Structures are given as C-alpha cells and as structure tokens.
Amino acid sequence: MATSPQFNFNNSPATNNVDHTKHEYQYNYTRIPPLAMVDTVPAKEDFSIAWYRLLVKQLKIIFVNTLITNRGNRGSKSLRDDIRNFIFESVCKEALPTQLNILGRVLQIAPQLLLARMSKDYREVDELLLSVIKDCGLSIFRDLLGRINTRLESGHPTGHVSSLNDYSKLLPVLDIPQFANTFLEDESFAYMQVAGFNPLMIERVSRKSANFPIEDSHYQAVMGNDDSLELALKEGRLYLADYKILDNAVNGTYSRYQKYLYAPIALFAVPKAENSNRSLQAVAIQCGQNPGAHPIITPKSNKYAWLFARTIVTIADTNYHEAVSHLGRTHLFVGAFVLATRRQLPDNHPLSILLRPHFEGTLAINDAAQRLLIAPGGAVDQLLGSTIDNSRVLVALGLRSYGFNGAMLPKQLKQRGVDDPNLLPVYPYRDDALLIWNAIHQWVSDYLSVYYSTNQDVQNDTALQAWAAEVQALDGGRVPDFGENGSIQTLNYLIDAATLIIFTATAQHGAVNYPQKDLMSYAAAAPLAGYMPASTLKGEVTEQDYLNLLPPLEQAQRQLNVLTLLGSIYYKNLGNYSPGHFPAQVKPLLDKFQKNLIQIEEIINDRNLHRPTYEYLLPSRIPQSINI
C-alpha cells in the first residue's frame, strides 16, 4: 500500500479532529426539506476578507448605477455628493433607539466618507462597507445594506414598458450586455440551448410524442421542403426541451402583479449534413403540456405570437436554471459532500486534502442563499414565476431526482443523446466541459494513485468507507444513487466520484452561475417570470401583449441588481492551490494538471475564433469552489 508522510490509513493521528468537527458540522433537513444543509455555519467556513472585498466592490457599482437610475445624474461632482448624502441619510435617519450604538460605531469607522468630499472612484464606499464587516460584524453590515436598499428602492421606475429601450435606461453606469442586442434573433434563441445559461435541457428525440402533435407542415415551414420530420427523426437531428417538471406550478404574485410560470415544450432541429451551417434551429413551441389547450407556434406564425412563445420557453428555462441546474444541482449537491468530508475524514486524509480547496465558501453561500434569496420575501420570491414554496419544492425535486452515478458528465450527455458531435455538431458547453472533465479526471487519478495501489486499499480505508456511508445515509447527506452497492469498492469509482465532486464545484457551477450577469441580468432577454397568461396566444398577439409579458421596470431593476452581483464575483480559479497544500511528491502531478489547463485555455480561445464566444469554461474563469 502506498502511503504519504501526511497520512497512514491504519493509524491516523487525526481521529480526534473528526470527533470534534462532528459537533461543529450538524445537519439540518428543514431549511429546504428534505435536503441536507448545515445547521449552523462554523466560523472557519465564513468568507475571507479578500472575498468580501470583491463583494463590496460590486455592491458599490450596483449602488451607483441604481442611485443614478432612481434619482437622476446631476454630473460627476454632484453625484459624489449625492452618494455621500444618501449613505449619511441611510445611516443616520430613522435610527431606532436600539440601533443608536450601530450608528455611533459606523460614524466612528468612516468619518471621511460622511463628512468629506468623496473621491472620483467612490472608494470610500468600499472602505465603509469593509470596515463595517471587520469592526462591526455581519449583522450590522446586513442592516446597513438593508437600510440603503430600502431607501434606494423608494424612487425606482415602475410599470410595464412601452418599448424595449425602456430596459436599457436601467443601466446608466453598468454596461448593457451584448446579449441585449441579439436575443430577439431566432439563432440566438436556439444557441442558448447549447451555450446559454442553462445548456442542459435538450434531449435527442427518439420517437414522436402524443402530447406534442407536430406535423410535417410545421417542420417544413422552418427547415424547408427537402427535409421532413421522419427523415430528421431517423437521422437523429431532432432535439426537445421539455419543461414538464414545471407543470402545475403554483403561480406567484408580487406587489400588484400576477406572475406566471409555464411548462412548455420546444422543438429544435439540426439541418441536414450537406448544409454548411449545422447550428441548432428553433422549429416549434407548445406553451404547455396539454396540446388541446396550447396551439403549436412556429417562426411562421404571427411575429409577436412567436416572440411571445419563445419568451415563455425562456421564462421556463430561467426558472429551471435557478432552482434546479444552479441551486439544486451545484450548490446543494456539493454542500452534502462538504459536511460528510468535514465530519468523517481527518484533515490529513488524502481525499480531504484533495477536496477541501473546492469547498471554500460553499457552506457559507448556501446558508446565505436559504436565509436571503429563497426566503419568503427574498429575491426568488419576488422575481421567479412561482410561489416561494413551489420554488423550494422544485429545488428539492431537482436534486432528489439527480442520482450521483448518473450525474457523471459523459453519462449525462449520453443519457440525453447529445454526446455525438456528428449528430449535434455545435454544442460549446459539451465540447468545452469534456475538456475540463477529462483534465480533472486525469489529475484526480494521478493524485489518488499515490495513496491507493489496489482496490483492496480502497476497501480497507475505514475513514473513506465511513465517508461513503454518511454521504448517502438518511441521517447524513442523503445523496441518491451513490457508491457501488452502498460503499466504494474500486479505485476507479473513487476517481470518478472525486472527479464529479470537483467538476461540479468548479466548472459546472461556473457554467451556470456566471451567465447570470451576461445573459440573464437584462430582464427583456431572460425574464424570471411571465406577467401574461399563455392563453394570450389563442388570440391575435400584439406588440403590447409581448411587452406586457415581460417584467415591469421595478422587477427588471431588482433582477438586474441581483444577477449582476451573483455573476460578477470571481474568487480564486481552478487549479490554483495554496503553496504547500500538497506534499512534495504530488507537485509534479499538480504541475501536469496546471499545464493541461493552460492548453485547454488555448484550445477554447481558438474555438472562440470560429463560433460565438463561449467563455464560461475557460479555466482562467472557473473558480476553485462554489462561493457565490
């Protein structure tokens, strides 16, 4: 058996460390029932000051953008005074007697901000917020942000838009995303299925479906008379995005607005092999699961009917993305492994050493999400299409239906029938993700082979087997379909399992988190809820019907602020481990991994010269862990 100076499988001196951490890391199954989350986040799992520095920098930019939108821009000098005065009012006015100590402490922290003129880059705002975090604590920091946000929202624009240009007025400082200029194009709509914020939905069609009665006339109107449904089906060129998981969702409300969430079915096709452009094309949409209640809409339908139907698909996609692909299948998926690792593996166990850098900030951000984002009255409740209770159920359903062994990237692609580049030539997410998956798999294989020579070594590692048992236990991580008959029997399985955990914590999260800023923050391009029923399509759809489907301006501003923040914080990057984290014998293996990542960066950059840019899986843009 191969061992390292750090760990001996038969006599670990760190067993007491595990016993102690079990008391610190307790499970809670009531946050988002029945999922496993941490009960109380241990102090050592909190974010670093470097992370908070990135956070407050983005908060400042969003704050300035919102202040100008809601209160006007009277020029740079006056704006600096406006910012200073606004924060002073937020801190000082209407302070409750019980909060006077907070006021006094904040005034002591940053008198230069409140009493002096502000610099051109507003860096005093950064200094104030960081000082509050360091000297007053997170509760006071959150209180201050709450005060600022409440006062800031008092002047926000309201109501439905009369033109798409109205949404651009919400970005006087922030850059208007490039996607805002292309999202109306059918090519862009289809491209989102393979390189968008949720490139995980489409499945190859193997047979016609009774609840989606598309006919050749629908198909040929888009793909041409020299093609047919039967031929496309036979050649494996038909792909479906079916949002049936959203069927019967309970529509939410916010303020005076009724919101809607839909369960559409969208058909896409790849042109025949002789075509020079074989990018995915949108063919037809049915805006619900019942064909009797929902007509089939195609690009040849009324212009605004098609745009309305497309938007319904996008709304379903954003809701599935946030609840299932993002929160459920990355954040909470990884969270269960953080807890089991902390509770069962000594700090000097080789698997713990390998995984821990990919867990930094995960328990803290998951706890913040359940307290702030998916709480009643939080951003999810305000912005997404269904009720908060329905959204939480969707998160749980999405994760509980995501079996671990079937979640391996190659298996996922094969199960959906999208693994063959000859059938689906243009799929940037697939192509780039496989590069990262294979590089991580090689690194994990090289690393674990230092410590385990045979399958017997794996089976005899009692800490590892305890970890595997807790990961799947009802009173543990509750991860479905984990292991080989309830344990880990082979080195190959251990390598695959560790690869999936690291891939999910890095590349997969990067692929679904960072498009929130570029592709989802501009509400017209990616609405988080609908504001008109799908039954509108039974009549003659007008431009104003389409505009009324989109979020009203106050909701659009909230969406802009939340998703810009979530998609802007990059903290550490894949493969960049702290010096000395691994023993010397591992360094050549790590060097090899890092060189592979550099080569992958070059390959993806070259690919982007020949396709619409897809950068979310560039190694330099993949964070080391889920921390936002």
How should each PLM-predicted stretch be described?
Residues 1-628:
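Long, compositionally biased charged/polar stretches
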